[in-house]
């Protein structure tokens, strides 16, 4: 059995409740509990591609990855187990979508760590379900209620936008830097002083702001953007479209679905998975970069100054340089060198 999060351990304290139920798991699910869950039926809707990868081999067509849940995925489900995410707006968006499809009378279980803000679930859903706290353990809260009324849901109403110079950035709940350009990305963009061309991969693209701003400066770049978040993927596509920029945007867990090599990889890599601190994605980004860069290709990333990336860069590339820094962030660059010549081979 794989390791379970505290929230899943709380759910298992009530496992007898679910044996005869047709359960839908959704929200910030970060483990394989659905694959080993004892219920009459189990389905999963996830907005995170790496969570889909974790579950798809076992649950096959019963796990769906995407921005919006569909009636087909939710068909026959009589119980929702929702894992509360870090972002309250993301919870509002996802629950409005799910509860607009699930039938009245559906049992709703909301679980999350106390520090995630799960306490606000009662007030958020008050017009549609009367939730009550039924358990508190492992620094988590578990709430239960029954759907009394379906909310109205219009996905288009959740879009927002802001400007970065002449670039319009389209965003959705749960996307990094939803309201404005973050200071780390601003510092990273400041290091691109001259136009350049070639193939560039943006890992963890968020709303597509890096590619869209740099495309204004260097229109000959061939862009590939990737993210694990379905909301980020859709936001990037919308940002690129409104700014008339052509690019490939794909779901990928760092390099899992990336093909080919690039002249440059750029990233403002996350160091959280939900509310948990995690350097896994950044470590995968750095360690795998040389396999996805041409000789002479560069990895350029921005990160909080306290994160231990210099040692990772030196281990992967042999060296690195700091292109810019301020009180909080540093921009690192590492270059793929030519492999040493084999003296046994004839020239």
UniProtKB/Swiss-Prot annotation:
It is an enzyme of class 2 (transferase). It catalyses: guanosine(1207) in 16S rRNA + S-adenosyl-L-methionine = N(2)-methylguanosine(1207) in 16S rRNA + S-adenosyl-L-homocysteine + H(+). It is found in: Cytoplasm. The keyword Cytoplasm applies. One of its GO terms (molecular function) is 16S rRNA (guanine(1207)-N(2))-methyltransferase activity. GO terms for cellular component: cytoplasm. The keyword Coiled coil does not apply. CDD domains: AdoMet_MTases (cd02440). Its EC number is 2.1.1.172. Keywords: Cytoplasm, Methyltransferase, rRNA processing, S-adenosyl-L-methionine, Transferase. Pfam families: MTS, MTS_N. Belongs to the methyltransferase superfamily. RsmC family. Specifically methylates the guanine in position 1207 of 16S rRNA in the 30S particle. Monomer. This is Ribosomal RNA small subunit methyltransferase C. The lineage of its organism: Bacteria, Pseudomonadati, Pseudomonadota, Gammaproteobacteria, Enterobacterales.
């Amino acid at each position: 059995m794989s390791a379970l999060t505290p929230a899943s351990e709380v759910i298992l304290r009530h496992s007898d409740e679910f044996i005869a139920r047709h359960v839908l798991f959704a929200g910030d699910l970060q483990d394989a509990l659905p694959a080993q869950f004892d219920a009459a039926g189990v389905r999963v809707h996830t907005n995170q591609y790496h969570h889909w990868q974790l579950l798809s081999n076992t649950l096959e067509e019963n796990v769906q990855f995407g921005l919006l849940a569909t009636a087909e995925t939710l068909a026959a489900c009589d119980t929702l187990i929702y894992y509360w995410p870090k972002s309250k707006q993301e919870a509002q968006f996802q629950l409005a979508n799910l509860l607009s499809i699930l039938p009245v009378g559906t049992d709703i279980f909301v679980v999350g760590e106390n520090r995630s803000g799960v306490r606000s679930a009662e007030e958020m859903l008050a017009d549609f379900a009367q939730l009550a706290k039924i358990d508190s353990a492992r620094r988590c809260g578990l709430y239960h209620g029954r759907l009394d009324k379906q909310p109205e849901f219009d996905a288009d109403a959740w879009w927002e936008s802001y400007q970065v110079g002449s670039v319009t950035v389209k965003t959705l709940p749960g996307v990094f830097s939803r309201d404005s350009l973050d200071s780390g990305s601003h510092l990273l963009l400041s290091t691109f002083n001259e136009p350049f061309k070639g193939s560039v991969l943006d890992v963890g693209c968020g709303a597509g702001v890096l590619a869209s701003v740099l495309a204004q400066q260097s229109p000959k770049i061939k862009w590939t953007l990737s993210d694990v978040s379905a909301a980020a993927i859709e936001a990037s596509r919308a940002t690129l479209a409104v700014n008339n920029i052509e690019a490939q945007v794909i779901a990928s867990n760092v390099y899992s679905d990336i093909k080919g090599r690039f002249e440059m990889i750029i990233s403002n890599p996350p160091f959280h998975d939900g509310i948990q601190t995690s350097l896994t994605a950044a470590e995968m980004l750095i360690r795998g970069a040389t396999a996805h860069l041409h000789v002479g290709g560069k990895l350029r990333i921005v990160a909080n100054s306290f994160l231990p990336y210099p040692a990772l860069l030196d281990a992967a590339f042999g060296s690195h340089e700091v292109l810019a820094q301020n009180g909080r962030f540093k921009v690192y660059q590492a270059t793929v060198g030519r492999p040493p010549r084999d003296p046994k081979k004839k020239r």
